[in-house]
Structures are given as C-alpha cells and as structure tokens.
Amino acid sequence: MEYLNDKDQHLIDKLSKKINDNNQYLGFLNTNTKELTHRYHIYPAMMIPQLAKEFIELTQQVKPEIKKLYDPFMGSGTSLVEGLAHGLEVYGTDINPLSQMMSKAKTTPIEPSKLSRAISDLEYSIREMTILYHEGNYKISNLPDFDRIDFWFKEEVIISLQLIKNCINEFIEDDLKTFFMAAFSETVRHVSNTRNNEFKLYRMAPEKLEIWNPNVTEEFLKRVYRNELGNMDFYRQLENVGNYSPKTIINKQSNIKLPEEFKDEMFDIVVTSPPYGDSKTTVAYGQFSRLSAQWLDLKIDDETKINQLDNVMLGGKTDKNIIVNDVLEYLNSPTSKSVFNLISHKDEKRALEVLQFYVDLDKSIKETTRVMKPESYQFWVVANRTVKMISIPTDIIISELFKKYNVHHLYSFYRKIPNKRMPSKNSPTNKIGNHSVTMTSEIILMLKNYINKS
C-alpha cells in the first residue's frame, strides 16, 4: 500500500507475526480480562483490555513520544484504564451517564490504606443501620419512587438498597463515593427482578421470582471487596510507570461536537470500539443502564429522560426530513449506498435507520479526525451485523468514511469473539448480499491520519 512507511510496516509485521504464530492470539482465550479496575462493572459488548494494551504497546514501540489517548466511545472505560496504566493522559466521551460514572470510578486510583479504612467504616455503618432499621429505631424517609420500581424490585430489596445508598452518601470525598457507587450499581442489577446474564430488561419467570430473595448487603460488600483488589493493583501499576498524577478527562456530551478543551490536533492515539448500530435491539445500552441510572440519580441532560438513552445514541433518532440522495453523495461511501439500496428493497424504514446510524457515525469520525495529530494511529474494533438478511460490512464503510477526511486504512486484523460459533473461514467480510451471519468475529481497523498537503 502506497501509504505505508517503515513505522507502519513494523507495527503491522509485529502483530501479524504474533497472529501467524498463534491464530487465536487476538482471542486472548484463558486470559484474565478482569485485571486492574477492569473488574469493577459489567457492561454490554465490552472491549477486552488485552486489545487496548496490545495497540498501545505496539504504538509506543514505534512512537515512544505519545502522551494522549482518546476514546470517542469509551463505554466501560477499558481504553482509558489501559492508557493510564501505560503512562498516558486519557480522554473519553460517552453520552451514557452510567458509562461516565463507571469510567470515572475505574480511572480514579485511591490510596489503598485510605480505601481500606473507608470500606471498614462503610460496612460498619451499613450493618449498624440495618440492625437499627429492623429494631424500629431507624426510618428510611427517602425511598425512591421511579416508574415501575415495584415491578423490578421486591420491597425488602428496595429498602436494603436505599439504606446502603444513604450510607454511601455520608462520604464527603467524591472519589470514595464514586468507587462505592460503582459497586452499588452492579449490585442494583444483580438483586433486581431481571433475568441473570441479560443486558435487556426481562423480568424473571414467576416461579423463579417467587423464590428470589437476594442478600443485598452481602452482594454489595462482595463487589466492594472485589473492586478493592482491583484498585490496589491499579494503584501499584500507576506507581510502576511513574504516573503519580494521572490525568483523565471525561466528556459528558456527544462526540459529534466536542467541547472547546478538545483542541485541534491534540491526541496521539485512538483506541475505541463504536456501537454496532443496533442499540435498540441487539446491544441495548439504554435498557442495560436504566435501573442503575435511576437508582444513582444519573441524567443524560435536563431535557432527556434516562429511558430515552437509546434514542439519543448514534442512529437512535431518524431524521424525517432526510434527503437520501444528498446524504449518500455526501457520505461518499459506495458500500453504504449499496447496503441502503439492498435493505430499502425489503424495508424502507429499516434502511433509513441504518443510514441514520452512518450519518451520525460520520459526524463523529469528522470530529475525531479534527482532534487527532497528523501521523497519529487509530485502532477501531468493529463487528459487522446483519439487517433484513443483509450483511453490513461496517469495517469497509468506516474506512470509506474516514478516507474523505484524509485518514487512511492501513490494515485489518481479525479476532474471533470467544464463546460464539465462527462463520466459515472463507466468508468474505466485504461481500454484500443475502447473508445472515451472527456477529462471531471482530475486525480491528488500523488507520492513520495523514498531513493534508492540498
């Protein structure tokens, strides 16, 4: 490829050799994906930390001067944690307030002995207040009353959760409070009446619900002590790399229009995994986040309710005044045009929804390009999905969208998503047509910003 220089080729060759030596290398099977603070909280479609670690370390080998990492879709904060663990300043964006809280908790190291004392104080407070409550000497006057709370939580669970929340709120320091709220958030999901291991909101079957009687306090403390170990490892790792004053900036607004502090040509590397484009169906970020966000009093903004989260994510709201031909011409992506035409023959409404996702993604790509330094690398982990039996090669579409902003696709690496059946090895990722293949593999796009000489 005409764009490759020696550094590009070295990076590609280095990772390619690892893959050639072990074709399951990027699968990271039997690898601990819960190191450091990555264990804090589950999240839909999480990028495993070993991927972010791989891309950062490879880039540092050819560009040891890099200082600032950006993740425009930070999700659970995986790339940010790995960036800090490798001595970088990190910046992330996500419109989901639960993502913001989780990422703040995971990127905030707390001195271990200080945290240990706080945990002891909190546990004592919770157990004491629980005894007082059952003796009738403590009344909880601020029980939540959000919509359908009695459908999703049993009465005794609501009482226990609010008691724990009240004890957490006694802490003055935000860092400690955020640490505890991360454990509280995951506890909320576990002790609710939702099915276990589901990201969407489905209520338990009646026969299971009848015997469902979680010990809320013990579930919460189990997560607190688990996360304490993660904080200790993270704190020591930052000491090991000399990152004594780690810098994390979390943008709570859309990555389509970044705030002023995100300057032109500011960042050295992007490591990210964008949404698949089906947040209302397959990967329901909004449904996953809703109960935790309601308990934590998290907001998207003053006008938008938390149950509308999926509507404000990329592609969540279709522009009714869209002029399709003009949009397709502007996107300048032959693949997205072909996909739109194929889907529209079957379902025009779905075709417009798919197109809207790529319109929004293009705006994000444009803004991401603005804040990236010339010659900087970007690593995008994507998965191709199927709509109306049409396979959508998102990897190719993203490459085409980037090209008009002078960001070029250098190489693609492939990894099997563990625990899923792999489609035929020879299935081409760039073939558009009648296919119905579940997302069993991911494509890692290696891209590079080029200096615009025009």
Swiss-Prot record:
InterPro entries: MeTrfase_CN4_CS (IPR017985), SAM-dependent_MTases_sf (IPR029063). One of its GO terms (biological process) is methylation. Keywords: Methyltransferase, Restriction system, S-adenosyl-L-methionine, Transferase. Its EC number is 2.1.1.113. It catalyses: a 2'-deoxycytidine in DNA + S-adenosyl-L-methionine = an N(4)-methyl-2'-deoxycytidine in DNA + S-adenosyl-L-homocysteine + H(+). GO terms for molecular function: DNA binding; site-specific DNA-methyltransferase (cytosine-N4-specific) activity. Belongs to the N(4)/N(6)-methyltransferase family. N(4) subfamily. This is Type II methyltransferase M.MvaI. It comes from Kocuria varians. The lineage of its organism: Bacteria, Bacillati, Actinomycetota, Actinomycetes, Micrococcales. The gene is mvaIM.
